């Protein structure tokens, strides 16, 4: 097939979304398809930038650009899914959450106008697609709740999924993620002051909250318990996963979350929270990890439990590894689904 993948690009910001986009393109090419990607430059302010980009995307028809027939469009992100094609499949990473679950309680009149424009755009363009998939149950439920649009959850593997491995655990908890408020590294930092065990905390990644988190560590006198290691290589990532006692991943209402899957591929238990969204689709309390309240003391208690019973920690990690493979999280399934009959 001749396939176009549409998505966004944000200069100088690279993360899980890029792995998702690039992974899909690579897997399509491996299977012999001709693939082009069209990535629209995304700017979230001023508001006029979003409005203009929505209008531009919706004006694009890729049925036969420059006389070249396109068999299928696969769109991944807002507002890139506004493009037109009769065989258009949307595989939704997430919508523009600031117009939905992250919409402020006391919006300005400008925010209300923009929100209405985005909701109208989503209702119109997503409904026009031949098929709609979501990258998790969480995203699918959000789309149904706010837009009354049905979608089918479709899981995919994390980047370099074959390279994760397991080693004997050491006494540290690993949390790799962007340092942002929604990822809630602060919960784990605050939990460290309540630990009774000698377990250390290693937090990897960079982001806008880096200085604030370091200040919190210093203020709480936790320099001997918590380390911010900043950016790390892929090989370092695999090693941290392989050697940790457990992985902490408790964002607020996460869309999907590669970190959960990476931990399971490394046969490590996952600590998450009751309001974390995507991770809850894989983490079963006391089976593949722990699901606790988003409270530092509750988090500290389960970390101490893991230290006190390392055999149980190992068993939960192995259960997570089995659960991952039982869920058919594979690119074969993804490609077969996205290119199936419409």
Residue ranges and their predicted role:
Residues 158, 164-196, 202:
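Conserved donor-binding/catalytic core segment of Leloir-type glycosyltransferases
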Residues 214-232:
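Nucleotide-activated donor-binding/catalytic signature segment of Leloir-type glycosyltransferases, i.e.
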Residues 252:
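Aromatic "clamp/platform" in nucleotide-sugar-dependent glycosyltransferases that forms part
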Residues 269-273:
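Short hydrophobic beta-strand element within catalytic cores of glycosyltransferases
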Residues 285-286, 290-297, 305-310:
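Conserved acidic donor-binding segment of nucleotide-sugar-dependent glycosyltransferases
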Residues 298, 305, 312-327, 333:
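A short, well-ordered alpha-helix in the C-terminal region of glycosyltransferases
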């Amino acid at each position: 097939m001749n396939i176009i993948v549409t998505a966004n690009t944000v200069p100088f910001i690279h993360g899980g979304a890029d792995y998702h986009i690039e992974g899909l393109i690579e897997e399509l090419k491996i299977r012999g398809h001709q693939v082009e990607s069209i990535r629209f430059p995304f700017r979230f302010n001023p508001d006029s930038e979003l409005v203009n980009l929505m209008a531009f995307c919706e004006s694009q028809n890729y049925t036969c650009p420059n006389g070249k027939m396109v068999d299928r469009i696969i769109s991944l992100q807002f507002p890139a899914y506004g493009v037109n094609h009769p065989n258009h499949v949307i595989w939704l990473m997430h919508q523009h959450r600031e117009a939905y679950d992250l919409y402020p309680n006391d919006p300005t009149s400008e925010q209300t106008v923009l929100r209405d424009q985005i909701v109208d755009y989503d209702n119109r363009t997503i409904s026009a697609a031949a098929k709609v998939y979501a990258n998790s149950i969480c995203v699918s439920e959000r789309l149904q709740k706010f837009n009354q649009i049905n979608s089918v959850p479709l899981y995919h593997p994390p980047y370099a999924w074959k390279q994760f491995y397991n080693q004997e655990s050491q006494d540290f908890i690993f949390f790799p993620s962007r340092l942002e408020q929604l990822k809630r590294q602060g919960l784990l930092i605050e939990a460290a002051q309540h630990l009774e065990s000698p377990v250390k905390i290693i937090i990897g990644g960079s982001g806008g909250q880096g200085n604030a988190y370091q200040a919190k560590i210093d203020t709480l006198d936790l320099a001997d318990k918590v380390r911010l290691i900043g950016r790390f290589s892929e090989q370092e990532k695999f090693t941290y996963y392989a050697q940790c006692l457990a992985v902490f991943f408790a964002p607020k209402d996460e869309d999907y979350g590669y970190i959960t899957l990476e931990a399971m591929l490394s046969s490590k238990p996952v600590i998450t929270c009751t309001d974390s969204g995507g991770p809850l689709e894989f983490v079963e309390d006391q089976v593949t990890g722990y699901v606790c309240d988003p409270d530092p003391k509750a988090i500290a208690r389960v970390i101490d439990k893991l230290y006190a019973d390392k055999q149980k920690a190992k068993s939960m990690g192995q259960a997570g590894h089995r659960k991952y493979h039982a869920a058919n999280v594979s690119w074969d399934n993804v490609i077969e689904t996205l290119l199936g009959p419409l």
